Curated annotation (Swiss-Prot):
SS bond partners: none
Subcellular locations according to the entry: Mitochondrion membrane
Major location (coarse): mitochondrion
Organism whose genome encodes this protein: Rhinolophus monoceros (Formosan lesser horseshoe bat)
Signal peptide interval: none
UniProt keyword terms in alphabetical order: Electron transport, Membrane, Mitochondrion, NAD, Respiratory chain, Translocase, Transmembrane, Transmembrane helix, Transport
Pfam families according to UniProt: Oxidored_q3
GO terms for MF: NADH dehydrogenase (ubiquinone) activity
Keyword NAD tagged: yes
Name of the molecule in the record: NADH-ubiquinone oxidoreductase chain 6
Top EC class of this enzyme: translocase
Gene name of the encoded protein: MT-ND6
Amino acid sequence: MMTYIVFILSTIFVISFVGFSSKPSPIYGGVGLIVSGGVGCGIVMSFGGSFLGLMVFLIYLGGMLVVFGYTTAMATEQYPEVWVSNKVVMGAFISGLIVEVVFVLCVLNSEELKGLFELNGMGDWVIYSVEDSGVFSKEVMGVAALYSYGVWLVIVTGWSLLIGVIVVLEVTRGG
């Protein structure tokens, strides 16, 4: 049952990102990001990261709802364009979905999928030891992996947030 839930959440996650990338109107782009953020937090929570999922939900969606509310108020159209009103936008949406399906099929058919990093053993993770037994903490492991193996991800995320703030400031100033 858990596999089906994660599969459905992942499908909604991909469709919302394809919908965001082929947005015909800023309102639908914001809705796509909000849906993908909420579903992404649900995926994280389904894998046992309840604290991380809740924090991302509160911080990401709380902050982004303010930004989307402000930018939507600035860019409101009386009759917003939808996906089916323009053949080019609908074609981009469908082609994005086809590319995602082909990618998933290629990944499922490949015998070996190599990751971006390798783990050298249990010594790379934080272990709580009590006498003869040790316990992993999932959230401590995630934070340790993020700042050791995923340092490039932190840098790209920080840079993307900075560029996003600059773009929002330029758009609202009319530059």
